[in-house]
Amino acid sequence: ANQEVSYLLQRIEDFPGVVILSSNLRANIDEAFLRRFQSVIAFPMPKAAERYRLWTEAVPRPLAPDGDLDFAALAERNEVSGGTIMNVIRYAALRSLVRGDRRLAADDIGDGLRRELHKEGRGF
């Protein structure tokens, strides 16, 4: 890991432009690494109302949520980032399209959420 961090820092120092890095794991980033950056901007996790809006507005047209899908409950129970919500929606949308269905299924949303939480080291 140290070798990879050193390589990344060297590439950043040699790059003539602006570099933007992103992480959902701020606690895992070494302070010495952070000191090398001019700006570090924290984006707080969206609140339940914001998550609800993200869930509902992320559904791509021409797909529609299945009648069993309760975005309000998802938003209330799952403290996740906007990026996670987008990944879950994309996963469920692809599953729907593969089936030839124009409805986002609650099961696909659940599967996608489990996958994303697993990637983050969290349970469902």
Regions found by a protein language model. Give the residues of each.
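AAA+ P-loop ATPase motor domain of ring mechanoenzymes
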Residues: 1-124
